[in-house]
C-alpha cells in the first residue's frame, strides 16, 4: 500500500528546473543575448543515474569534479554530458526564452522588472505542457541566487505566473538550491548553454543534440524595431 501511494505521488509531481545565461550588462560590452531555460521532467530520474555514474568515472580518474557546469567543463566532459542527455532526451521538455538585450528598453532592465517579465513569459510556454497542467504538485527549482533583490524578483515572477495558470488544487514548492546539489539544475545549465551559444556565436553543434525536445524557443523582441545601443 505504501509503495502504491509513493508511486502515485511520484507520477503526479512535475519538476521544473530553471537556468539563465548571459549577463546584465546592457551595453555594447555585455553579452548580446540573455537566455532563460526551463527543463521539465518527472521521476524516476534515469538521466540522473547516468550523470552520477559519469561523475564517479571522473572521480576514479583523479578528476576532482564537484558538479557539471557546461561553460567550465572541458570539451571531453561536455560531450559526455550531452551524450547522457541525448540518451534520455525523451524524458525532458525544454523551453527557452531569448532576449536580444539591445532591444530591452531602459525601464525594463532592473532585475525586479526584468525577471518577472521574462520568467512570466517563459513559464506560460512551460505550463502549456499537458503533464504540467495535469500535475497535482509542481516543484520549481532554481540555482541559488546570491542577490536578494534578484531572488525576490524571481520568486515574484514564478508565484504570479503559477497563480494565474495553475488549476485549483494544484500545489507547488519554489526552491533555491546550489546547482551542485541537483543534476536537474546541471541539465538545465547544459541546455541553456547550448541555446545561448547558438544565438551568441551561431554554433549549433550542441544545440542540435537537444533541439528535438526544445518545445519553445521564443525570441521575445523579434519584432522590435528599436535598439537602445
Question: What positions do the PLM features span?
Answer:
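Phosphate-ester processing/binding pockets and catalytic centers
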Residues: 1-229
